[in-house]
């Protein structure tokens, strides 16, 4: 089958990465369709609907490239599957990663299903990751070539079934090259800055945004031995290892968040970047997903490396099944500020094996006060 007989539906955000993704596929001769996903009804601080601006960029890019385009509304799916989860996690005192859930439930589920209904053979996105397809049909996901932009961390929950229908055309080139291609082609998004902030919601003031949905309950900020250091403005606004925004003055080392007590509405703080309370030996994680589950013997356990947050260096770990629903991940050496609600993502070299969501953190067999 030649490329012109293969239909690829590209998820287009109005950014440079998805624009170049569509261009590359078109150049390779595929039957390309661009789809803009509208997942949040939003305006920026100036009252401008950012989704409309982004969609206008998608229209212009698709016209430049010469491909058809559509907009699809996934607001209900996003609210039900991602945003509700996001709020529930904050209510539990955890720090969720909505991008992980957004990829699992929206970009590579709702969008993937929609694309298949359009007769797509594959979907493509502008993620910095790579797919390796074996002769027997199974696939592996590899880190993007641009180490600084690799996004496999956020894709860790994707299954073999999902990834077998996915293309990441820019995963094997550097970000600077993506910009160069966009400029060379005169794409309107060539100089558009990268989006940051919450998946699909953008760069809002996080505290203001969250307070619209969850009532804040101020409370005491104390040390682990009970010394009162001030007031916090609501546990949901703080994460483990956080330094800024505590408002604790005085001499000596900076202060850091080392735990939360939801029952008493207390935020625990201690002084010093390397305070002992910030370090742990192992974690328990649930909602685990592996790209090739049969390759990993969870009963015997296996060694690999892991990341506990985006753009963190890999750490050597040992992964073993804890029970029917959870994994125990033991670190080769203590790790600082592991955060319940975040993803732990597993690697063998460049291959992303999968990941899980961190529940509890332990030191010397005792659970830490990270979230109690």
Swiss-Prot record:
Site (Interaction with tRNA): 127, 342
Keywords annotated in UniProt: ATP-binding, Cytoplasm, Disulfide bond, Nucleotide-binding, RNA-binding, Transferase, tRNA processing, tRNA-binding
Keyword Phosphoprotein: no
EC id: 2.8.1.13
Recorded GO MF terms: ATP binding; tRNA binding; tRNA-uridine 2-sulfurtransferase activity
InterPro entries: MnmA-like, MnmA-like_C, MnmA-like_central, MnmA-like_central_sf, Rossmann-like_a/b/a_fold
Active-site feature positions: 102 (nucleophile), 199 (cysteine persulfide intermediate)
Gene Ontology BP annotations: tRNA wobble position uridine thiolation
Source taxon at top rank: Bacteria
Cell compartments where the protein resides: Cytoplasm
Keyword Nucleus assigned: no
Region (Interaction with tRNA): 149-151, 309-310
Residue positions binding ATP: 11-18, 37, 126
HAMAP family membership: tRNA_thiouridyl_MnmA (MF_00144)
Xref: NCBIfam families: PRK00143.1, trmU
Family classification: Belongs to the MnmA/TRMU family.
Protein name as annotated: tRNA-specific 2-thiouridylase MnmA
Source lineage: Bacteria, Bacillati, Bacillota, Bacilli, Bacillales
Underlying gene: mnmA
